[in-house]
Amino acid sequence: MAPARKFFVGGNWKMNGRKNNLGELINTLNAAKLPADTEVVCAPPTAYIDFARQKLDPKIAVAAQNCYKVANGAFTGEIGPGMIKDLGATWVVLGHSERRHVFGESDELIGQKVAHALAEGLGVIACIGEKLDEREAGITEKVVFEQTKVIADNVKDWNKVVLAYEPVWAIGTGKTATPQQAQEVHEKLRGWLKTHVPEAVAHSTRIIYGGSVTGATCKELASQPDVDGFRVSGASLKPEFVDIINAK
């Protein structure tokens, strides 16, 4: 029997916080009883990666919220994977809907970033998800499969990749996909993986859900067989993040 997938909870602090209130949040996380069989990763703003890594309990990993597709160069405002590692972070979030739709990042660029980050030794939380008009048009599968294919084409070793399904219509809106909606897409994503990567990889790759996850909604979502964890934004800045980490 294949081993169970380790539950994964990632907090995305986005462009929020200052040292004083992030320090309070970190103290709350450090003092909390967290399950040993759940992997926890926090993604602070780039300016606070070093601060978070120094203050957080070592069992909680740190991620960057973005990186570029090359190591160095004349790319004002960007950060390379090697720099991220130098700050003590071990993960990077790529393909978030805000990077896609606010900053205009293409599937191709996201794929290039994934390839470079993995080559440099970072773990990648790769985000995919449809917009509301795409869901209403009945093309959710088409959209997320196309996004996943570009990511898969750039992955050689899936051990350091987590797929995050984040329906854009549920991010920061207070709307959450029902457990059934989340499970349906996660199950189809795993089915897509089974036909495009080795079956063992399809089984072991974690597919997590993001989109207005709260302490009130997390337990039922976590009970779904193909929901392997969460990406949490607003609630990750609040004490209820501890409840979400303990959802499984």
Curated annotation (Swiss-Prot):
The intrachain disulfides are none
3'-nitrotyrosine carried by residues: 68, 209
For this chain, the site of the Glycyl lysine isopeptide (Lys-Gly) (interchain with G-Cter in SUMO1) cross-link is 142
Q: Which residues carry this modification: Phosphoserine?
A: 106, 212, 223
The primary location reported for this protein is cytoplasm
Q: Which UniProt keywords apply?
A: Acetylation, Cytoplasm, Gluconeogenesis, Glycolysis, Isomerase, Isopeptide bond, Lyase, Methylation, Nitration, Phosphoprotein, Ubl conjugation
Residues reported to bind substrate: 12, 14
Which residues are annotated with the PTM N6-succinyllysine?
149, 156, 194
Q: Which family does it belong to?
A: Belongs to the triosephosphate isomerase family.
Subunit description: Homodimer.
| UniProt-recorded name of the protein | Triosephosphate isomerase
The organism is Sus scrofa (Pig)
Upper taxonomic lineage: Eukaryota, Metazoa, Chordata, Craniata, Vertebrata
- Originating gene: TPI1
